[in-house]
Regions:
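N-terminal beta-loop-helix "entrance" segment that forms/cooperates
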Residues: 45-58
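A short aromatic-anchored loop/beta-hairpin motif
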Residues: 82-87, 93-101, 105-106, 110-113
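Extreme N-terminal starter segment of soluble prokaryotic enzymes
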Residues: 2-7
Length: 124
């Protein structure tokens, strides 16, 4: 049986940390069940790719989801999940001047369109 493939489109970070955490919690559960997935970060979500940024998200609701930085570490280190960054957002969020997290790559919107040809999308 062919693996199901997904792309998680994340558009929030500091503005809605619980939304980002919920997406990553779901993704962690899905990869544990052998589903293939990666993330495409857009708008405020691109900040998650900035090294050290996820650790600053300390105002999540208590006892709801694991902290964003812990979820990202698990997804990257244990499951090899990639975090693609929308190239149109790079200059606006000054990501061209900082170090990115492991498994982060800058890609154009057309790359997301290509991914959507054979993947289901979940947007947060």
């Amino acid at each position: 049986m062919e693996k199901k493939k997904f792309v998680f489109i994340i558009t929030h970070s500091y503005d809605r940390p619980d939304l980002a955490a919920g997406a990553m919690q779901l993704a962690s559960n899905m990869v544990a069940f052998d589903m293939e997935l990666d993330f495409f970060l857009m708008d405020d979500g691109v900040l998650l790719a900035k090294e050290g940024f996820a650790e600053t998200l300390t105002w999540q609701k208590k006892d709801e989801f694991s902290p964003v930085h812990e979820l990202m570490k698990t997804l990257i280190d244990d499951f090899g999940v990639k975090f693609y960054i929308c190239s149109s957002c790079v200059k606006h969020y000054e990501l061209d001047k900082v170090k990115l997290v492991k498994n982060a790559e800058i890609k154009p919107g057309s790359f997301l369109a290509e991914m959507l040809r054979d993947r289901q999308a979940l947007t947060f």
